[in-house]
Amino acid sequence: MKFEEEKIMAELRWNPLIKDWVMIASHRQNRPQMPKDWCPFCPGSGKVPDHFTVYKYDNDFPALSQNPPEPDDVETRIYKTKPSYGKCEVILYSPEHTVTLPELPVPHIRELVDLWTERFVEISKDPKIKYVFIFENRGDVVGVTMPHPHGQIYGYSVVPKKLELEMESCKEHFEETNNCLICDMLEDEVKDGRRVIIENEDFISFLPFYCEYPYGMYIAAKRHIQNLTQMTDREKTNLAKILKETAGTLDSLFDYTFPYMMCMYQNPVNGEDVSDYYHFHIAFYPPMRSADKVKFNASSETGAWAHCNPTAPEEKAEELRAAHEKFLKKMNG
């Protein structure tokens, strides 16, 4: 049997079982291994400016593109394809190669918040973009290949399934109660108090009642807002503060750079108005359940979306509050 020469594919393919789109991006397999003594994100590499604080860098191997190729002719009566239209950007947090988010001063993180805001606005101008997703992967255990401190932004041409489910739940709650679901969640968390870790004038960091990961903290805005552009100057600075303290709390648990996935949830763009019922929040998904043990998303979590947290959130919240105190003492030196 003769096999065809390997072909580069970049398209979206429809999963009819759960009504969701899968990104096919075979060209990402060809990402080169970087030499250990060279980093494209460091000043002097020729890839980035010699002087910057934070910086937007177009992904060299994007899963989504604003000039995507036509999909392969593989559609059937069941299977659908569409172009892998979208935007993939890298957001460099600092010119320093080994610094981490909680080690940056608040004014520096505030510049990062401003850059996120600027990119949210710019990417949203494209009418084909339906969701702007800001995120960070940190640590080898979540597959990070570039240690230089950075996050990413994806502009999707569809609203991803999980976010669609969140919107539906929030809308249903609003129609039943005339309240925002996340506003009500915050009210319950504050009233209970046991899972609240950090609080400032504008944001709360807490371990949700239902958290799937032992140390999976959320940050939510106290005011009912949907995205970064609606924040006041004070709110943006307080977001920078609570991001620093939340990431620093995780690092202080076991005195090492704690791996995590950080995801920012904002309203969809160029579509239905969700301002009555959706609410800005950030979720941290740290894959560790102890200093040296990983909480794997195994068969139940992956195959059934049935998550099992092997710890009690109320007990882990006590650990996190102690780690927060430890971080503050270190920060205030």
Residue ranges and their predicted role:
Residues 268:
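An internal, amphipathic alpha-helical element
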Residues 2-148, 154-226, 248, 259-262, ...:
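Active-site microenvironments that recognize anionic phosphate/pyrophosphate groups
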Residues 238-257:
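Extended C-terminal subregions enriched in glycine
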Residues 226-235, 239-244, 273:
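A contiguous, surface-exposed recognition patch within enzymatic or periplasmic domains that forms
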